[in-house]
């Protein structure tokens, strides 16, 4: 991929996505469940660009949404309503009504209160709501605490006994149709053992429900498959799928999974231009035009993305300590223009001297990059570009100042 040409053509900061890589990841995951009925529902929150959603819908993907906005995005991008799932711990009435009116595949419920509210709304609309219940198996996903969701101390889902009670209520309700069961224990999971253990617990509950004449059709294992940012080892897809399927013996269910980061994470790159270097005593900084409002993961999660620089036609990667003196690489922080000490994209990285206009490329930026960006410091958000079959095309233009203030200007009087 010619990052220098893309930066010259579209400017920086810039997100670039490799659509061919996304297709490869989707097909690899889908094929790992080839012996079973399965549905891969892409987690829209990871990267919600309409062109990304349209591309994945064309491959046959379903969509896991956590707001009515994401449901509407998926529909706008061409998704079939019967391949959309609405999740999320706090759904408003208008979101539940929209899901009911558009007859999506199922609504993942997270509490008894939510079930009662949905039942009331379905009755008002004269509908029967297809539901799944998110079961919290009390499993430690061994990931960052901000993205761990499968423990009793987390806000997500209900315990096994509460789930049974909810399913029995739904079975006897004319306005609820229990069709699925759901669990999701966390994100960026690189050890599949907790996922398989959670599947075992939920599968046993599914057998109990089937015995009680509750026809569970969809077994949703959630998402969370991790990717390589640095030195991690990526889970083996065959072992992941077979570990789940081994627990489903005798169960006639469609397996649903909800990957987000796994599909788009390593398909994305964040390009930012060097403004200048500066030194505070012995501390070296490379100041770039990208910032925490563009890519907040390093500041928010202490995430460490691999980076490299492009200078004078050369690709300059981080190097090991023994190479530093020979190549004139020195430790530095890559920081942005925002008025926060937490505004950094990388810390303590070994890079060579860089000049204004050189590029810094941050890898693994396709998930939770642009999706979590903001207009902090009244900065317009970056443009997004897709590359497919060697061709590049704009999929979101750069925000202008007028875009940023558009919703406020009319109130100036």
Model-flagged regions — what are they?
Residues 16-23, 46, 50, 65-68, ...:
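Electropositive phosphate-/nucleotide-binding environments in soluble metabolic enzymes
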Residues 1-129, 168-177, 204-207, 211, ...:
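A charged N-terminal "starter" segment
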Residues 243, 252-413:
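Charged (often Lys/Glu-rich) extended helix/loop segments that serve as interaction or gating elements
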Residues 43, 130-136, 182-184, 220-222, ...:
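Short beta-strand segments
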Residues 138-277, 351, 379:
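Active-site loop/helix belt of alpha/beta enzymes
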Residues 53, 76, 96-101, 118-121, ...:
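Short acidic, glycine/serine/threonine-rich loops at helix termini
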Residues 41, 130, 218, 254, ...:
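Hydrophobic "anchor" residues on beta-strands that sit immediately upstream
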Residues 46-48, 69-70, 90-91, 111-113, ...:
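Active-site-proximal loop/turn and secondary-structure-junction residues that shape catalytic pockets
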């Amino acid at each position: 991929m010619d990052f220098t040409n893309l930066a010259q053509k579209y400017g920086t900061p810039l997100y670039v996505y490799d659509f061919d890589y996304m297709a490869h990841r989707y097909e690899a995951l889908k094929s790992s469940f080839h012996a079973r009925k399965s549905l891969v529902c892409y987690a829209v929150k990871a990267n919600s660009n309409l062109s990304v959603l349209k591309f994945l819908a064309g491959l046959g993907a379903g969509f896991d949404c956590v707001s009515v906005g994401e449901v509407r995005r998926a529909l706008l991008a061409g998704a079939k309503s019967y391949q959309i799932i609405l999740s999320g711990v706090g759904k408003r009435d208008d979101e539940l009504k929209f899901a009911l009116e558009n007859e999506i595949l199922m609504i993942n419920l997270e509490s008894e209160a939510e079930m009662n509210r949905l039942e009331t709304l379905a009755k008002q609309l004269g509908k029967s709501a297809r539901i799944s219940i998110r079961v919290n198996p009390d499993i430690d996903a061994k990931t960052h605490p901000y993205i761990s969701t499968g423990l009793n101390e987390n806000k997500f889902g209900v315990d096994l006994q509460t789930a049974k009670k909810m399913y029995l209520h739904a079975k006897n309700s004319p306005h609820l149709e229990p069709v699925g069961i759901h669990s999701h224990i966390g994100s960026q999971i690189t050890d599949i053992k907790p996922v398989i253990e959670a599947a075992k617990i939920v599968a046993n509950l599914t057998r109990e429900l089937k015995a009680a004449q509750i026809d569970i059709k969809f077994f949703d294992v959630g998402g969370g498959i991790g990717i390589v940012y640095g030195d991690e080892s990526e889970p083996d897809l065959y072992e992941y799928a077979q570990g789940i399927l081994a627990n489903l013996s005798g169960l006639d269910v469609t397996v649903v999974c909800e990957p987000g980061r796994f599909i788009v994470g390593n398909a994305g790159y964040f390009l930012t231009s060097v403004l200048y270097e500066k030194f505070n005593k012995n501390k070296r900084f490379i100041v770039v035009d990208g910032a925490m409002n563009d890519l907040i993961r390093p500041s928010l999660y202490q995430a460490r993305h691999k980076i490299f620089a492009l200078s004078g036609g050369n690709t300059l990667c981080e190097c090991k300590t023994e190479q530093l003196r020979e190549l004139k690489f020195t430790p530095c922080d890559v920081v942005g223009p925002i008025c926060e000490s937490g505004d950094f994209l990388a810390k303590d990285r070994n890079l060579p001297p860089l000049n204004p206009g050189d590029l810094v490329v941050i890898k693994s930026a396709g998930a939770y990059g642009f999706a979590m960006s903001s207009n902090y410091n009244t900065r317009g958000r970056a443009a997004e570009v897709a590359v497919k079959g060697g061709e590049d095309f704009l999929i979101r233009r750069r925000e202008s100042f007028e875009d940023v203030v558009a919703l406020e200007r009319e109130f100036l009087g």
